[in-house]
Each structure stands twice: as C-alpha cells, then as structure tokens.
Amino acid sequence: MERTFLMIKPDGVQRKLVGEIITRLEKKGLKLVGGKFMTVSKEKAETHYGEHADKPFYEGLVSFITSAPVFAMVVEGENVVEVTRNMIGKTNPTEAAPGTIRGDLGLTVGRNVIHGSDSVESAKREISLWFEPNELSVYTANDEEWLYEN
C-alpha cells in the first residue's frame, strides 16, 4: 500500500483545523499510520524545502514553518499521493476548487494550511526526513475489506 507525507502547517494548527483535516482523510478511506505535533527546526525546514532555496519566497517559507507547531503525518492508501493531492487542491487557495482542503480552508498562498508530497519519490524522501521507522504503525483497519477491490 502506498504512503504519503502530509503536514498541517502552523496556520492550520493555530486555526484548530487538524481534526477537520484528519476527518476528511479518514472519510476518504485513507489510513493514518503516523502523526506528531512538533516545532520544526530551521535545519529540518531548510532540508525539507531545499528545492526552493534559490526562490524569493524561500526564507519566508522557512521562517513561517518554524514559527509555531505543525502536525506531521503519514497516510496510507491506494494511489494515496494522487488522492491526497486532489483533496488538497491547488497551492493558491483562491485557485483551489471548492471542496478541496485549500479551497475550503486556505486563506492565501502563504497561509494555505497543508503540505502534501507531490510524488511517490518525494513522499519516500519526506517520510524518512520527518519520521523514524518505529514511529509508523503497520495494521489492518477493520474497514479495509470494504474500501479496496481485490
């Protein structure tokens, strides 16, 4: 089963949206296999957003993500990267479709509530950056037989 990394950003935590976002993911049939509140170190933020280091918004992004706690999580499901990207919506909440997390809850590009891995490769890299293997659970949910075709 595929896994992806999601992070509810400081704006989402401060606005008390963690429960709503997890509920949306679980209603979609996705399984939470790891999660933790944490204050992000500057080093971890710089590593996570390293691909943007040469962009003008990089310093502000690092500063924002380290400014208050985030909720980092790993979610599992069939085609979970694609499914969660569709659920999250476009980066700019004003362009995100109604019904998506950013379309419904995001305010601006800089306060768009959530990060999600954009590929299976990114998900693997980000999961290993944010979680130790022993922090992730392996279990069969009671409803899995109803969610996936064999």
Curated annotation (Swiss-Prot):
SMART domains: NDK (SM00562). CDD domains: NDPk_I. Its EC number is 2.7.4.6. One of its GO terms (molecular function) is metal ion binding. It catalyses: a 2'-deoxyribonucleoside 5'-diphosphate + ATP = a 2'-deoxyribonucleoside 5'-triphosphate + ADP; a ribonucleoside 5'-diphosphate + ATP = a ribonucleoside 5'-triphosphate + ADP. Keywords: ATP-binding, Cytoplasm, Kinase, Magnesium, Metal-binding, Nucleotide metabolism, Nucleotide-binding, Phosphoprotein, Transferase. ATP binds at K9, F57, R85, T91, R102, N112. Homotetramer. Major role in the synthesis of nucleoside triphosphates other than ATP. The ATP gamma phosphate is transferred to the NDP beta phosphate via a ping-pong mechanism, using a phosphorylated active-site intermediate. This is Nucleoside diphosphate kinase. It comes from Staphylococcus carnosus (strain TM300). The gene is ndk.
